[in-house]
């Protein structure tokens, strides 16, 4: 017997929640960023990240599984052809949630959820910048001591 999911239920019924998440994910993949309520953004993040992970493999079976959840073929092609190659080197964390001001009409907490497509900074580059910063700090400390 399936047990009910705990937590926020968007729209009342489970089928309505699935449709809401499907439409939000489609809009996120189409536009790159969307404004929505905090509750919807928090539920959309793992949903969208699982779809992006499936798109990274690029197999026909994964494309069909994503097509079951997102019925728009253009958005599926954007996901597999544009978004997945940009995040191929990432192992997760494809989305970012930024808190915004509350909505004017009903004071609902709003957020912007967006795709993270920037390149990851390599550990060697960050190590080099830290080394340069520490060397500069040592030079400043030495000049102040004199």
UniProtKB/Swiss-Prot annotation:
GO terms for cellular component: cytosolic large ribosomal subunit. Signal peptide: none annotated. GO terms for biological process: translation. Keywords: Ribonucleoprotein, Ribosomal protein. GO terms for molecular function: structural constituent of ribosome. Residues 124-134 have a biased composition (Low complexity). The keyword Ribonucleoprotein applies. The keyword Ribonucleoprotein applies. InterPro entries: Ribosomal_bL17 (IPR000456), Ribosomal_bL17_CS (IPR047859), Ribosomal_bL17_sf (IPR036373). It comes from the Bacteria. Residues 124-146 are annotated as: Disordered. Belongs to the bacterial ribosomal protein bL17 family. Part of the 50S ribosomal subunit. Contacts protein L32. This is Large ribosomal subunit protein bL17. The gene is rplQ.
């Amino acid at each position: 017997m399936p047990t009910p999911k705990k937590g926020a239920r968007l729209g009342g019924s489970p089928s309505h929640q699935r449709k809401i998440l499907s439409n939000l994910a489609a809009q996120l993949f189409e536009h790159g960023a969307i404004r929505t309520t905090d509750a919807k953004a928090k539920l959309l993040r793992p949903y969208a990240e699982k779809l992006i992970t499936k798109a990274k493999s690029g197999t026909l079976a994964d494309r069909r599984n994503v097509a079951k959840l997102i019925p728009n073929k253009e958005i599926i092609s954007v996901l597999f052809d544009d978004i997945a190659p940009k995040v191929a080197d990432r192992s997760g964390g494809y989305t970012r949630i930024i808190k915004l001001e509350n909505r004017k009409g009903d004071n609902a907490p709003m957020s912007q959820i967006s795709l993270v497509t920037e390149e990851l900074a390599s550990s060697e580059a960050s190590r080099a910048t830290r080394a340069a910063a520490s060397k500069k700090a040592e030079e400043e400390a030495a000049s102040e001591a004199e």
